[in-house]
Amino acid sequence: MAVTSTAQACDLVIFGAKGDLARRKLLPSLYQLEKAGHIHPETRIIGVGRAEWDRDAYIKVVREALETFLKEPLDPALWTTLSNRLDFCNLDVEDTEGFKRLGTMLDQQNRTTINYFAMPPSTFGAICRGLGQAGLNKEPARVVMEKPLGTNLASSRVINNQVAEFFNECQVYRIDHYLGKETVLNLLALRFANSLFANNWDNRTIDHVQITVAEEVGIEGRWGYFDQAGQMRDMIQNHLLQILTMIAMSPPADLSTDRIRDEKVKVLRSLRRIDRSNVHEVTVRGQYTSGFVQGKKVPGYLEEEGANKTSNTETFVAIRVDIDDWRWSGVPFYLRTGKRLPSKCSEVVVYFKNPALNLFHDSYQQLPQNKLIIRLQPDEGVEIQILNKIPGLDHKHRLQTTKLDLSFSETFNQQHLADAYERLLLETMRGIQALFVRRDEVEEAWKWVDSIMDAWAMDNDSPKPYQAGTWGPVASVAMITRDGRSWNEVE
């Protein structure tokens, strides 16, 4: 297969090789990169874990994972190529001897080592220390870290300080997989390559913005993790705020890594603080009760296996976000995310202001607003809703909302739309950090989120119940209705 010019020979070391993330996401993504010819012929993939496996045992585990989680049959020729890259190192992250063994396996000149931490953040410090003591932290070595990076600003700083003791910021790749989604990446092109939007992307023309990330699933057996995190920490602090920054950022001087990140940080620093004085006006917490999702009976959050029956952890959050800068002053951003909602979808809806003069007042006291809908999943694409005259001989101008719909899969005729992890893994191999989160981004997001969490805690605020299979508590509808607006109806 042809190798792209940006591919580099590297050693990809996966800590937590037998874990859920590696099996469900990383290995299938590596298979697809192999299929597309993006992996350099000399690149190796080394699984790391405490299991007493040899290379053959690990190869068997990888094959089983691919056969389970790939969405297509395993190609024998591709499998042969991929399996030839595989190796395994038995290692306990607290054992220095294990890192010495890993160092022996990696003892090759002019190769980049990518250390992917597919393990809990509580282990990151020990892994970095082990790599550092074994001399495996020198550039161009890289580390890739998964969320959650802490549970608040203080704990996030502890983790980042542990990593920074052994790795420079230019070596650190913090993953938010939403940044690898094709439609999120398309936001830059949509906004800055098209004069239709580039010249009309501020408070002069935009009325408000809605960002919805909805999940049909519950906690999927992750009670221990989720009850400590909740929807605010699990989704708002990272995914939704990252999407918000991509929508709200000003044009960067160029598309280099730090220019883009600098603009995103400016947005985070401009978020209006939410505290006890306004938290009940602009936020809603919810917790699902039993109900029906897609016609199937599902238990409530407090009825899930292993549940603490007195838990006040939120499974739904809606927030009105105000950005205090010249571009967005007076334009609210409404964020909404939850579990056990009617359907799985992620979308951004930009509502444009109506013309100052309504020439069609005989038919419409208020015109329906033009909308730009950016679908992040499941059917990635962009939809514009505009008004057109309904054909006919009627002397009145009867208008109808018309959709201009661009579906990525149909428009670009691609059988396989690259998964976010495929792109992010490839970017780590290329050494490009633009799609990863810089430390100051993480910490600015935590500052804003912590203020809300503290306000909830001080008021002993309990989440409002909502039935599984509905769009969250009634209070979330009331919050946006008070502003004279309504949530976009997800189709």
UniProtKB/Swiss-Prot annotation:
Substrate binds at H177, K181, E215, D234, K339, K344. NADP(+) binds at R50, D92, V93, K147. Pathway: Carbohydrate degradation; pentose phosphate pathway; D-ribulose 5-phosphate from D-glucose 6-phosphate (oxidative stage): step 1/3. Keywords: Carbohydrate metabolism, Glucose metabolism, NADP, Oxidoreductase. It is an enzyme of class 1 (oxidoreductase). GO terms for molecular function: glucose-6-phosphate dehydrogenase activity; NADP binding. It comes from the Bacteria. The keyword NADP applies. Its EC number is 1.1.1.49. InterPro entries: G6P_DH, G6P_DH_AS, G6P_DH_C, G6P_DH_NAD-bd, NAD(P)-bd_dom_sf. GO terms for cellular component: cytosol. It catalyses: D-glucose 6-phosphate + NADP(+) = 6-phospho-D-glucono-1,5-lactone + NADPH + H(+). One of its GO terms (biological process) is pentose-phosphate shunt, oxidative branch. The active site is at H239. Belongs to the glucose-6-phosphate dehydrogenase family. Catalyzes the oxidation of glucose 6-phosphate to 6-phosphogluconolactone. This is Glucose-6-phosphate 1-dehydrogenase.
